């Protein structure tokens, strides 16, 4: 039986429908080398609804797209497990399409293959896959996510990349504290933008920020010149910090840092110690970047009188980018906003105390450690005149204005004088438990029984940090003298500084504590002490006053080695009683001259501290006064503007009253005219009626 025309049409329609369905639904050929679903699946990077254009009928169909690994899957529904098709993104490129002026509501982008070998990997359309997002923001998110996947094998895509991976990738350019993008943005802002009003608060141009982001993600290094907008570069820096997969302070440390913020609100000194401990425990890359950013933000707030960006404003802007919870629900964000802002304020304001200035050449050294070298003490060296008293080699990782608290048991214990020479173990690592800027001295800590070796407490190391370690190298092992009871007053005489960035005084005026100390050293040790005093003088008396030491030394049995080595300038050397004259008799700490020198030094320390406090108070008062004046000026402007608006409203009210009176008068006139017309009409009709009646009466007799 021959097929009829209708059967032929049905067969052709069935074949056409089957072929069209296979093309539209994205089915791949079932050849042995082309499986339907790839075997290797990566993590889900992004998922959402998109519209894809069908290949034959060119209409749009909505599908659930999932970006997993380097493949883009699409499903008919969100709950389906079997994809209708997938697109391999390796070797492809994604492009944003300009909206059609006739139909501006479409947000289109397309994925095109990079070469002839990649074209067969796009199942729905061998040329390009056209997709449409629901909004401009959604389209930009999809394009950025797909580009990161495309550029990831090439070592690119710095935005959204883990900080450790970025640092590891840029290690070939040399040791750095921050990624190249951050350094480039910071250098440009430091050069051209510190005086820009509203820095980091005013947004940059969105399209320029996106172009710069794409350039950095592509591996390019765009240069900033005089035509580059400062706010655009600032927005790019904030965008990089915001798009880190894990913030600078990791998610696991979020609760610990919030606890530090709560402690800061109760006890600022203890909170600073705990915060420094938490900062030192950060990973190396995070630690370096946080230190770099806080130092830069401190430079920005130093120009707050011009750029109007105080520490609080910078903390508000950068706090959520530096420290944020892993699950950003509204309740958690509202509860931690004030704490995060306060914590960021402390990090910026006290960055010099919280971050130890470690060297880039020694990244393996942990934060907060002091390395004590070998130290040998022999009786033969004591007995020889002119011998180098105590050779001590100490290297320290404490550099900069970082504070340290040394344990009482950290110095090596030496044997008695009758025993053999005691040698301390060489190259020991002592971990400092805390970094502290304001040290609170307890009175009971000064007490120590007799016969116990010397203990040393170093609450603060000032900006010239190495003078302390060098100065301590001249100390000998000794016992506490009988005057240790009088040293109790030194702890109670301590008082905290009014501000955290002003080092607390150790009250050198407690002459009883100083008077109970006597020592005699050899000539070489004397030079070390003098050098330490010189460094102490260079680092300002306020920094020297922050050092509190407790010791009691027995008179040294050294014979007279040289004479006439006493410093000629007693008025400019704080450690002059330490140096001595080189004779076998120890200096008398109770002499009037030395007591006068000590009192003068104590008064100088107090005066320097009070001057620093007054200077800071004056700065704070000027700043608050300036802010009050600015607020008053704004209020005056607002009041004048309100008065002008009130005058305008009064004029409008007067005009409305005039119009109302005019309308009432017009209404009254209209009513009078209406009444007049009514009477005239009545008279007219009455006259007309009488005339009509008279005419009828005259006709009737006829």
Curated annotation (Swiss-Prot):
GO BP term (any one): regulation of small GTPase mediated signal transduction
Result of changing residue 201 to A: Loss of function
Domain Rho-GAP: 161-355
Xref: PROSITE patterns: PH_DOMAIN (PS50003), RHOGAP (PS50238)
Pfam families reported in the protein's UniProt record: PH, RhoGAP
Site feature: Arginine finger: 201
InterPro entries cross-referenced by the UniProt entry: PH-like_dom_sf, PH_domain, Rho_GTPase_activation_prot, RhoGAP, RhoGAP_dom
Keywords for the protein's UniProt record, in alphabetical order: Angiogenesis, Coiled coil, Cytoplasm, Developmental protein, Differentiation, GTPase activation, Nucleus, Phosphoprotein, Transcription, Transcription regulation
Localization per Swiss-Prot or TrEMBL: Cytoplasm; Nucleus
Keyword Magnesium: no
Ranges of residues in domain PH: 43-151
Stretch list, region Disordered: 360-433, 438-457, 480-511, 555-596
Gene3D superfamilies per UniProt: Pleckstrin-homology domain (PH domain)/Phosphotyrosine-binding domain (PTB) (2.30.29.30), Rho GTPase activation protein (1.10.555.10)
Modified residues (Phosphoserine): 365, 397
Compositional bias segments (type: Polar residues): 407-421, 438-456, 491-504, 581-594
Cysteines joined through disulfide linkages: none
GO-annotated molecular function: GTPase activator activity
Chain coiled-coil ranges: 594-691
Gene Ontology terms: cellular component: cytoplasm; glutamatergic synapse; nucleus
Tissue: Predominantly present in endothelial cells (at protein level).
PANTHER family given in the database record: RHO GTPASE-ACTIVATING PROTEIN 22, SPERMATHECAL PHYSIOLOGY VARIANT
Protein role: Rho GTPase-activating protein involved in the signal transduction pathway that regulates endothelial cell capillary tube formation during angiogenesis. Acts as a GTPase activator for the RAC1 by converting it to an inactive GDP-bound state. Inhibits RAC1-dependent lamellipodia formation. May also play a role in transcription regulation via its interaction with VEZF1, by regulating activity of the endothelin-1 (EDN1) promoter.
Assembly behavior: Interacts with VEZF1.
Name of the featured protein: Rho GTPase-activating protein 22
Organism: Mus musculus
Lineage: Eukaryota, Metazoa, Chordata, Craniata, Vertebrata
